[in-house]
């Protein structure tokens, strides 16, 4: 079981002898807890480290201690790597440059994420196929669409991964799932090396999370390389976005299982081996017998809600993934109609005086904000937060003609304000310097003064929320609450 004095985990799986294997769980979030729980069940020696020490972490830590783990919480707890460590399992977001991870890599200790661990720990008699989704934007929505279509087909399916539910937790369910719809972030893919998925999709590729890759000579290239890992050893279909050549190049370069196919999705008329749109219908020219000369109707565009160009792309990708799994055509439209997305995704939260207030707090980078802004004609834009190393010049240039005004707030408000000054100097801009949660109410007040009947006040920040809020949902709730108190244009008289 040993190799060069260490435990050789290169082929470790559920049937591997985990007793005596020393595993460090870096981070006690939902995925860290699930990883620790699964490894304890296999008799591994588990040490959980997290610099946080709040009630939630203490509660989870206490449960794991009862099960046999050692748990260290509080500042500095996750800074040191014990000498006897054989494996590190990191929570999403842990960078290679963080001291504990860097020490592990230097010492040749394997570092895995929860998806890698989950893949290895699937029971050989109960292998659950994965339909996996990544991309800069649209991952969560596409994962939800995929799950809903699978349910409409009568399959026992579960949305897992970056969407919020750990894969290991779902694997422990008594439900014998037929298939998983798996959302994977670039962070999770970075720490995954043995996945061999049934089918996988990269929805798009744009600048995001570049601060995570700041140590690399080519941050965007490294980010793209991690996204492309999802196609490695795919067994059935590699789904790509025809409108985003970078995703097709990833498929071309992928090392897949013999027989795996490249399947494109497009908002235009599809060619063979594509899913696309004809006369308001989503049609399949990929998974039909006579794909060179015929197409099969899957759904109507009105089945997609909320209706926006980027959300149609999400639906096309979900259709491709589920059709690759043999889902019958009628289930695609039914699944799209059945789906009710969570809030903060192009959600109309208020209408008054001819003005529509839309919460797209989930738009946490410029590409997501661009997708949202494409759906509206006249916009008062509320933007700002943590830019994560991204830029806004292209976004501002693209939409300058439809901007009635802009309100910027958050840590990197100056970056957006400077882009507006350079590329849209005619657009009125209000800068909110308040760094408390009251900033959103002030932003809504200023937006109301600029908006006119027929306008949309769009909160599509293009930035992360953690500078002020605990998450994008809280930011969206503050926007919605403030917007609902607005009566109409220039409400303060």
UniProtKB/Swiss-Prot annotation:
ATP binds at residues 135-141. It is found in: Cytoplasm. It catalyses: UDP-N-acetyl-alpha-D-muramoyl-L-alanine + D-glutamate + ATP = UDP-N-acetyl-alpha-D-muramoyl-L-alanyl-D-glutamate + ADP + phosphate + H(+). GO terms for molecular function: ATP binding; tetrahydrofolylpolyglutamate synthase activity; UDP-N-acetylmuramoylalanine-D-glutamate ligase activity. Its EC number is 6.3.2.9. Cell wall formation. Catalyzes the addition of glutamate to the nucleotide precursor UDP-N-acetylmuramoyl-L-alanine (UMA). This is UDP-N-acetylmuramoylalanine--D-glutamate ligase. It comes from Cutibacterium acnes (strain DSM 16379 / KPA171202).
């Amino acid at each position: 079981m040993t190799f060069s004095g260490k435990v050789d985990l290169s082929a470790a799986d559920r049937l591997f002898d985990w007793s005596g294997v020393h595993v460090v769980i870096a981070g006690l979030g939902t995925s860290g807890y699930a990883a620790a729980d699964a490894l304890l069940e296999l008799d591994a020696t588990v040490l959980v480290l997290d610099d946080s020490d709040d009630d939630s972490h203490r509660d989870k830590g206490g449960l794991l201690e009862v099960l046999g783990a050692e748990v260290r919480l509080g500042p500095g707890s996750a800074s040191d790597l014990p000498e006897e460590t054989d494996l590190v399992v990191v929570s999403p977001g842990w960078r290679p440059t963080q001291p504990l991870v860097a020490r592990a890599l230097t010492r040749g200790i394997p570092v895995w994420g929860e998806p890698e661990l989950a893949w290895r720990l699937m029971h050989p008699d109960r292998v659950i196929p994965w339909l996996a989704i990544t991309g800069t934007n649209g991952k969560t929505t596409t994962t939800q669409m995929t799950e809903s279509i699978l349910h409409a087909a009568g399959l026992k399916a579960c949305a897992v991964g970056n969407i919020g539910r750990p894969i290991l937790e779902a694997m422990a369910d008594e439900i014998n799932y037929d298939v998983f719809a798996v959302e994977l972030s670039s962070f999770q893919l970075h720490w995954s090396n043995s996945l061999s998925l049934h089918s996988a999709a990269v929805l798009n590729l744009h600048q995001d999370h570049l601060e995570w890759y700041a140590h690399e000579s080519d941050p965007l290239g490294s980010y793209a390389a991690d996204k492309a890992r999802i196609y490695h050893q795919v067994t059935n279909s590699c789904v790509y976005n025809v409108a985003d050549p970078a995703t097709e190049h990833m498929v071309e370069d992928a090392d897949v299982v013999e027989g795996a196919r490249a399947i494109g999705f497009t908002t235009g008329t599809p060619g063979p081996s594509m899913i696309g749109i004809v006369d308001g219908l989503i049609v399949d020219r990929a998974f039909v017998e006579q794909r060179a000369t015929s197409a099969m109707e899957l759904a109507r565009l009105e089945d997609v809600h909320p209706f926006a160009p980027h959300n149609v792309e999400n639906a096309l990708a979900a259709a491709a993934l589920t059709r690759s799994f043999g889902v019958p055509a009628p289930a695609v439209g039914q699944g799209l109609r059945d789906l009710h997305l969570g809030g903060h995704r192009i959600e109309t939260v208020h209408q008054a005086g001819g003005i529509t207030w839309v919460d797209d707090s989930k738009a946490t980078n410029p590409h997501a904000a661009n997708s949202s802004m494409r759906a509206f004609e006249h916009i008062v834009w509320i933007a700002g937060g943590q830019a994560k190393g991204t830029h806004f010049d292209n976004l501002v240039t693209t939409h300058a003609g439809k901007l009635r005004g802009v309100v910027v707030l958050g840590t990197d408000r100056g970056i957006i304000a400077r882009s507006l000054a350079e590329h849209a100097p005619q657009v009125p801009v209000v800068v909110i310097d308040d760094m408390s949660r009251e900033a959103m109410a002030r932003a809504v007040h200023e937006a109301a003064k600029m908006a006119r009947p027929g306008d949309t006040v769009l909160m599509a920040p293009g930035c992360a929320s953690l500078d002020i809020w605990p998450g994008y949902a809280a930011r969206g709730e503050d926007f919605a609450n403030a917007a609902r108190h607005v009566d109409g244009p220039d409400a303060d008289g």
